[in-house]
Amino acid sequence: MSFPYEYIFKYIIIGDMGVGKSCLLHQFTENKFVPDSPHTIGVEFGTRIVDVNNKKIKLQIWDTAGQERFRAVTRSYYRGAAGALLVYDITRRITYNHLTTWLTDARNLTNPNTVIMLIGNKKDLEGQRDVTYEEASAFAKQNGLIFVESSAKTGENVEEAFLRTAKLIFQSVQEGNVDLIPDGGITKNPPQTITDKPQDASKCSC
């Protein structure tokens, strides 16, 4: 068989409960908004193949639960993440105030070269905004994060968030800053094409 992609990048999505992590995952992988998406219990998983610099890359995305009682379980999924999407709700300051705790976990439990993207979600609710763009941008700059505001409902900047993260991970690969091993969150498929040996029809029992 031949692989339809050359690399696999592991992502995790982290942040408080109700910030729209699962909605971001569904919007990116299925191009749809699920308004009544139930709160994630443990983890949820999704994949999508994207094109970065003419290379096919499979993104394996782990959406983690935001509730405190699941933190011990979800922390195990941080290991080996090549990219981390740190999400808060621009209409709920409490979710922004908790970013430092989430970021500390990400820094302690992932790799030094993990790309961390800060996402201010629910941009479609501008009239209810409780965290300014400038404030979050300053936080991102201070902590060396990439930053974007998005809307899982309208799809605004969702694609950009995932793809921009993938481009920075791929850049690290090209520069030799990361190891191509599963524990590093990045796997490279063999360059050769593997062909299944056809079965001898004369030996088939039909």
Swiss-Prot record:
Bias (Polar residues): 189-206
Keyword tags: Endosome, GTP-binding, Hydrolase, Lipoprotein, Membrane, Methylation, Nucleotide-binding, Prenylation, Vacuole
Membrane-topology annotation of the record: Lipid-anchor
Keyword Hydrolase applies: yes
Activity regulation remarks: Rab activation is generally mediated by a guanine exchange factor (GEF), while inactivation through hydrolysis of bound GTP is catalyzed by a GTPase activating protein (GAP). That Rab is activated by the DENND6A and DENND6B guanine exchange factors (GEF).
Lipidation sites (S-geranylgeranyl cysteine): C204, C206
Renumbered ranges of motif Effector region: 37-45
Subcellular location: Endosome; Contractile vacuole; Membrane
UniProt modified residues of type Cysteine methyl ester: C206
Organism superkingdom: Eukaryota
Biological function: The small GTPases Rab are key regulators of intracellular membrane trafficking, from the formation of transport vesicles to their fusion with membranes. Rabs cycle between an inactive GDP-bound form and an active GTP-bound form that is able to recruit to membranes different set of downstream effectors directly responsible for vesicle formation, movement, tethering and fusion. Regulates the fusion of phagosomes and lysosomes.
Protein name: Ras-related protein Rab-14
